[in-house]
Amino acid sequence: MVSLLHKFLENASGKKGQDLASTAYLAALDHLLHSFPSIGKSIIDELKSQRSRLKMIASENYASISVQLAMGNLLTDKYCEGSPFKRFYSCCENVDAIEWECVETAKELFGAESAFVQPHSGADANLLAIMAIITQKIQGPAVKRLGYKTINDLTDKEYTELKAEIGSHVCLGPSLNSGGHLTHGTVRLNIMSKLMRCVPYEVNKKTECFDYSEIARLVRTYKPTVLIAGYSSYSRRLNFSTLKQIADDCGAVLWVDMAHFAGLVAGGVFIEEENPIPFADIITTTTHKTLRGPRGGLVLASKEYDAVINRACPLMMGGPLPHVIAAKAVALKEALTVDFKKYAHQVVDNARTLAEHFQKQGLRLLTGGTDNHMLIIDLTSLGISGRIAEDILSSVGIAVNRNTIPSDAVGKWDTSGIRLGTPALTTLGMGSDEMEEVANIIVKVLRNITLRRNADDSFSKSEGELPENIAEEARARVAGLLSRFPLYPEIDLETLV
């Protein structure tokens, strides 16, 4: 049996551009196919699947092969609870070197005073942020007030009273329907809502944008300990100078969740008051969205919170993932390049172009457009749900996700909108011409979806249909785009049998 690697090397013989990264990647797949065939096959099938779809889910992207290779190594075998040079385990000097380099690179990239690179996800980073704020702003003063040195000195009664006090403090954050994330505390099913009293703020019903005067009114009313700014489905930028002033007026901590737009900050697209770094007390982010890194999280903070955040173990974490930290370091170094800055600007240019073509063809976008990497289409006038649109678009090779909109009448599962993003398509090299073609394909599909008729002659609320001729045309146009902009072109799919 001829191995994948042998076939790849034979095909690559004499070709320019053959590099160690693609060879190493194929060697890893080759080994898995022979040793664990079902796993190897599923990985290859996923590569084929991703190469056959336009990835327009705003929270997804493509990491470089270098980033992926940095994750697949023996670093995964090392336990390293603690922080660099202060571990609970011995023999961590090599992990220390990698994590320290990752930290310093993050600080350089964002211009931050401190960086913590261990969180396994954005949700973990957010949980660490709120725990750090609770520790610094509520627990610490309470322990000192009672005349103790540490929380372990409290009696059971005092500890119970402290937990009740923590639960009475207010955290003000964006609601889910207004573009916030479930970890912002306004969804009671999430652990964040169980730690403090979480109060939501909404977008303005007319503009569908955040109203700073209304946020300021709520801050004066509730006097929150924490003000959260950030979003997972909001197509405009935020003014962090204004938000900092609002927070300072009541002594609140300004916590910014920039998971979606971290790459736009790193790439110099969001500058001055649109850059949260100079204004926020704590900033959390993922590393796998616009940053194009591995799945994981980061916490950037002012010096006030540096010590408590670096004590994430035992605060709310155990052992970090050193192999992922290595991959984060690679991604952050990639983000320091001129090419990444060009990429970040192109992401926003592509989103604006996409929005313009949607609007020209009569689709309604939340907020009337976009200033960042994403846009949300209101499907109400088309008479279909976000779930139906998501399913039908997926069937023709376009990956989007259904999304709630303000005052959503359909509900959180089926939704009235879809969210689209340009980070992944921009990584493939697509530009304004391709965005016009993508918009045209999507509009034609959406306008031709009809509701499936049930057995009782009523219409389904969750299933739609698309005429086969429209579907075939859309698939062909999608395939045409992807043939010109293949994912990981250095990996020859013909060898992946």
Swiss-Prot record:
Alphabetical keyword list: Amino-acid biosynthesis, Cytoplasm, One-carbon metabolism, Pyridoxal phosphate, Transferase
Coiled-coil segments on the chain, per record: none
Location of the protein in the cell: Cytoplasm
GO BP: any one term: tetrahydrofolate interconversion
UniProt-listed InterPro entries: PyrdxlP-dep_Trfase, PyrdxlP-dep_Trfase_major, PyrdxlP-dep_Trfase_small, Ser_HO-MeTrfase, Ser_HO-MeTrfase-like, Ser_HO-MeTrfase_PLP_BS, SHMT-like_dom
A Gene Ontology cellular-component term: cytosol
Superkingdom of this protein's organism: Bacteria
EC id: 2.1.2.1
Enzyme class, UniProt record, top EC level: transferase
Catalytic activity entry: (6R)-5,10-methylene-5,6,7,8-tetrahydrofolate + glycine + H2O = (6S)-5,6,7,8-tetrahydrofolate + L-serine
Pathway stated in the Swiss-Prot or TrEMBL entry: One-carbon metabolism; tetrahydrofolate interconversion; Amino-acid biosynthesis; glycine biosynthesis; glycine from L-serine: step 1/1
Gene Ontology molecular function, alphabetical: glycine hydroxymethyltransferase activity; pyridoxal phosphate binding
Role summary: Catalyzes the reversible interconversion of serine and glycine with tetrahydrofolate (THF) serving as the one-carbon carrier. This reaction serves as the major source of one-carbon groups required for the biosynthesis of purines, thymidylate, methionine, and other important biomolecules. Also exhibits THF-independent aldolase activity toward beta-hydroxyamino acids, producing glycine and aldehydes, via a retro-aldol mechanism.
Family: Belongs to the SHMT family.
Name of the molecule in the record: Serine hydroxymethyltransferase
Native source species: Chlamydia abortus (strain DSM 27085 / S26/3)
Gene of this entry: glyA
